[in-house]
């Protein structure tokens, strides 16, 4: 007698890849033409409790405020205005408490975000890129994390790309007989 296979798929996303992919997908919401960063906060039960991306504050027009990186006057740059992904993920949390949670983030946090992460009680930061490693902000963030006991580590992906194919839901699974 033949039966339809009931063996699970082997090519599913493991939790770390899933959470980092959610951070990267969230980053696609950013309107910043130069830097798209996303963050995903996860609790000990592998439940997402917060997602954020870099953008202007709620109620402030991202069509009016500047997106440039440099200008003669700092007020003509994005830096005094933009909210980082980490801030937005903490503020957008769907849980009353993120204490003890982990944060997956595309870019290693700056010192200002490190302070927010520490104050929120997040205990682990997993980042993809540390391209500003030698900056004063990243150095201060590492110092703060070390002092507060927040662990941080670089994410090592098992694959370099994850493809989202909206048409795949319409295909019928092949029926393999044993």
From Swiss-Prot:
GO terms for cellular component: cytoplasm; cytosol. One of its GO terms (molecular function) is 5-hydroxymethyl-dUMP N-hydrolase activity. Its EC number is 3.5.4.12. Its cofactor is Zn(2+). Gene3D superfamilies: Cytidine Deaminase, domain 2 (3.40.140.10). Allosteric enzyme whose activity is greatly influenced by the end products of its metabolic pathway, dCTP and dTTP. It is an enzyme of class 3 (hydrolase). Keywords: Allosteric enzyme, Hydrolase, Metal-binding, Nucleotide biosynthesis, Phosphoprotein, Zinc. Pfam families: dCMP_cyt_deam_1. PANTHER family: DEOXYCYTIDYLATE DEAMINASE (PTHR11086:SF18), DEOXYCYTIDYLATE DEAMINASE-RELATED (PTHR11086). Belongs to the cytidine and deoxycytidylate deaminase family. Homohexamer. Catalyzes the deamination of dCMP to dUMP, providing the nucleoside monophosphate substrate for the thymidylate synthase/TYMS. Also, part of a nucleotide salvage pathway that eliminates epigenetically modified 5-hydroxymethyl-dCMP (hmdCMP) in a two-step process entailing deamination to cytotoxic 5-hydroxymethyl-dUMP (hmdUMP), followed by its hydrolysis into 5-hydroxymethyluracil (hmU) and 2-deoxy-D-ribose 5-phosphate (deoxyribosephosphate). Catalyzes the first step in that pathway, the deamination of 5-hydroxymethyl-dCMP (hmdCMP). This is Deoxycytidylate deaminase. The gene is DCTD.
């Amino acid at each position: 007698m033949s039966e339809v296979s009931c063996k699970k798929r082997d090519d599913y996303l493991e939790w770390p890849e899933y959470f980092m992919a959610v951070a990267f997908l969230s980053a696609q919401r950013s309107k910043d033409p130069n830097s798209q960063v996303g963050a995903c906060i996860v609790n000990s039960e592998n439940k997402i409790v917060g997602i954020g991306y870099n953008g202007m504050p709620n109620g402030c027009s991202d069509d009016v405020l500047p997106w440039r990186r440099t200008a003669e006057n700092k007020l003509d740059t994005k830096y005094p205005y933009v909210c980082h992904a980490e801030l937005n993920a903490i503020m957008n949390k769907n849980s009353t408490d993120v204490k003890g949670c982990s944060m997956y983030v595309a870019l290693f946090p700056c010192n200002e975000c490190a302070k927010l992460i520490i104050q929120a009680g997040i205990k682990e930061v997993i980042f993809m890129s540390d391209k500003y490693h030698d900056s004063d902000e990243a150095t201060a963030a590492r110092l703060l994390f070390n002092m507060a006991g927040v662990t941080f580590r670089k994410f090592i992906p098992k694959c370099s790309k994850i493809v989202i194919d909206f048409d795949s839901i319409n295909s019928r699974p092949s029926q393999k007989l044993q």
